[in-house]
Amino acid sequence: GDASHAVDHPIGGHPEHEHDLREEEGPLIFPMKDLPGTPGTVGGLALRMGQFIFAAASVVIMVTSDEFINFTAFCYLAAAMALQFLWSFVLATIDVYALLIKRGLPNSILLSLFVVGDWVTATLSLAAACSTAGITVLFDKDLNYCDQMHCRRYQLSATMAFFSWVLIAISSLITLLLLVSE
């Protein structure tokens, strides 16, 4: 009877009515503002810091080579990674500010700027990393120039650029998802 109902099912209703309760609650939705890596969060700051650290490493490794200035792809990588460094550093600074004032970055105009800037720098970074990697493979495998050149240094610089690109691609995707969810 009624007394056994409370003992048999102390937490919820009767099992045959549980389906009705689930329909009323609706689907579980993960709020996009809580997505790890969103701008203005510790995760977002970590992504930006990784971007500018790898970009800076790529530039430093490339420009410490004597011959890099003689090859367009290598100069392009240095320029693209310098731009990536500046962009990511500015956005990391904005993330630090948002964390200090304990507010997110909900402004859709600002998020739109982040997405477009991320896409531009990501495209430039990927193109630069690919061209540098391609030229380095050409020098190493086809022309056998690596005996006289710093091919390992060029490969390492391209690798750092790829790492930076992966992080900017993640940031841009997260920011885009946040933007379209508003």
UniProtKB/Swiss-Prot annotation:
It comes from the Eukaryota. Residues 63-73, 130-159 are extracellular. Glycans are attached at residue 70. GO terms for cellular component: plasma membrane. Pfam families: CASP_dom. It is found in: Cell membrane. InterPro entries: CASP_dom (IPR006702), CASPL-5 (IPR045009). The chain crosses the membrane at residues 42-62, 74-94, 109-129, 160-180. Disulfide bonds: none annotated. Residues 1-41, 95-108, 181-182 are cytoplasmic. Residues 1-20 are annotated as: Disordered. It is a multi-pass membrane protein. Keywords: Cell membrane, Glycoprotein, Membrane, Transmembrane, Transmembrane helix. PANTHER family: CASP-LIKE PROTEIN 5A1, CASP-LIKE PROTEIN 5B3. Homodimer and heterodimers. Belongs to the Casparian strip membrane proteins (CASP) family. This is CASP-like protein 5B1.
